Amino acid sequence: MSTHVAGLGLDKMKLGNPQSFLDQEEADDQQLLEPEAWKTYTERRNALREFLTSDLSPHLLKRHHARMQLLRKCSYYIEVLPKHLALGDQNPLVLPSALFQLIDPWKFQRMKKVGTAQTKIQLLLLGDLLEQLDHGRAELDALLRSPDPRPFLADWALVERRLADVSAVMDSFLTMMVPGRLHVKHRLVSDVSATKIPHIWLMLSTKMPVVFDRKASAAHQDWARLRWFVTIQPATSEQYELRFRLLDPRTQQECAQCGVIPVAACTFDVRNLLPNRSYKFTIKRAETSTLVYEPWRDSLTLHTKPEPLEGPALSHSV
């Protein structure tokens, strides 16, 4: 989106019949304004309406809020890439996996902490920018609904400045939606005597959250079947970590009804559960050395079925 909104291209706009945009209050205002002032008023008002229905529409803001909620559930990783790969070169001279052999482990751990901090700050800034967009739209929409013509005439410069500010916020928000490069102040490779070392870039990457399939997951009498999925399937298979625990254990022995299960698939059956009890399950990716931030994991509570009733046999008298 361009941040240039001065004039809003009003001299190039081909407006239809202005009367089609008028409500009764606007019709009353038309009687009070000179024809030239009225023309300027309607053109600027229509330009603002166009901005609020296209560049900053409620539907668009709703989509941004949904994307923001998704980003808060994603997992964030640090990627080590030679500069030519980070810039999009598809013919690697040095594979990323080989770079880890050259990197100082202690320095890499420090950079992971930097990646964690940068990710947290980025998410906080995105939330703040989205609030500014909500506030800016509400403010501009109130101007559009107001019968007062002054903001569109004598005070139009202030409105244009506000439009430019909101457009700049939108540009910053869209740019920050994509995780970027980590800023490295020092060399990650300690052994400078090694053969020619490529210029290394550290990038932040995002993985979509792991979510339980609530329709396919179910509890039976003494076992439960759990299924989960990732919105965008990874190119390679992933390892997961399934946790479970009994809610409200009543004895010391029942406190042992919990566990952590490594799983290499997207489904697993948890056995030896107690009947007629509630269990909480959580799912996440297995932790790797490149994970820097994972603020959320999906959880699901299931209730096992009770044991069948076993009563005395019924006798029938003739």
Curated annotation (Swiss-Prot):
Pfam families: DUF5581 (PF17744), DUF5581_N (PF20996)
Superkingdom, natural source: Eukaryota
Annotated ranges, domain Fibronectin type-III: 210-307
PANTHER family membership: FIBRONECTIN TYPE III DOMAIN-CONTAINING PROTEIN 11 (PTHR14537)
Protein's name in the database: Fibronectin type III domain-containing protein 11
The species this protein was found in: Homo sapiens
Encoding gene per record: FNDC11
